[in-house]
From Swiss-Prot:
Residues 1-26 are annotated as: Disordered. HAMAP family: GTPase_RsgA. GTP binds at residues 162-165, 216-224. Residues 1-15 have a biased composition (Basic residues). Its EC number is 3.6.1.-. One of its GO terms (cellular component) is cytoplasm. This is Small ribosomal subunit biogenesis GTPase RsgA. It comes from Mannheimia succiniciproducens (strain KCTC 0769BP / MBEL55E). Belongs to the TRAFAC class YlqF/YawG GTPase family. RsgA subfamily. Keywords: Cytoplasm, GTP-binding, Hydrolase, Metal-binding, Nucleotide-binding, Ribosome biogenesis, RNA-binding, rRNA-binding, Zinc. One of several proteins that assist in the late maturation steps of the functional core of the 30S ribosomal subunit. Helps release RbfA from mature subunits. May play a role in the assembly of ribosomal proteins into the subunit. Circularly permuted GTPase that catalyzes slow GTP hydrolysis, GTPase activity is stimulated by the 30S ribosomal subunit. Zn(2+) binds at residues 298, 303, 305, 311. Pfam families: RsgA_GTPase (PF03193). It is found in: Cytoplasm.
Amino acid sequence: MTKRKLTQNQKRRIHSNNVKALDRHHRRAKKEIDWQEEMLGDTQDGVVVTRYSMHADVENSQGEIFRCNLRRTLANVVVGDHVVWRRGHEKLQGISGVIEAIKPRENEIARPDYYDGLKVMASNIDRIIIVSSVLPALSLNIIDRYLVICENANIPAVILLNKVDLLTDEQWREAEEQLEIYRKIGYETLMISAISGKNMEKLTALLADGTSIFVGQSGVGKSSLINYILPEVNAQTGEISETSGLGQHTTTSSRLYHLPQGGNLIDSPGIREFGLWHLEPAQITNGYREFQYFLGTCKFRDCKHIDDPGCALREAVELGKIHPVRFDNYHRLISSREENKSQRHFMEQDIR
């Protein structure tokens, strides 16, 4: 009997289930350390540079990294968190100490999860770098989805188009025209290639200031960018799936890196879909910065900005003040939000 060939999705599910089973076994075999007062030193400040399921790596003021347990009373600890922690007088089961408290966050980036609600990914970020590429095909709808998140989190965004070495001259001009839509409304854009090195010096100069985070679908080349910027990290890269056109997930844990030219970079696991169903329609509307001048000037206060008479946004599109692609994407995001919210409702019913 011929052995059935597994699809890439099936292989990923099997791998994921195996990892979860091993993690459950690890939890049972390795009891949580009960840190007593006499076992710990004084409190000190630190920054979370990596988060795992049960532990977090904390960097102290001298740049040393210690693996720590988390107090049960803490909310979700994420990469970028400034924390108060205590080092143990001795290392126990490979653990050096415990995180006692999380300092107030300046900001955070979160994504909705069907089972866990809103999941914070990272905190204390100075800019979000939205990584897109020409393979898979450039999607302005996905870029707009990320921008809505950035605007609602009040974190500046930069749009990065990777793999431009694959473009013909005509495709380059088309990509420039698409990115010009965003430049006209105040977003910074970069066209780069981690393979040829084109414009990579502009990216490294941008990253030298503050803490940045890469977000983007799998397969857009985030790991390749990190390998170029930090070759000693050797982040695992993945191939594009021939069947779906999507990349294979390669990064498993969010991590903060210090860059040699200054600044920090957070690499987060690839996200295929950045859902918006946790946002209200008004929040999605407010996520379009060029809409702000026209909001509140529609004929009717409850205008849905679809085919309502006297819609100021639609009039602005007709006058060339709002790009029609952005307006179409806005409607698609509103529509997909309702669909995803309905799917979540049915999933919650199944769970109950």
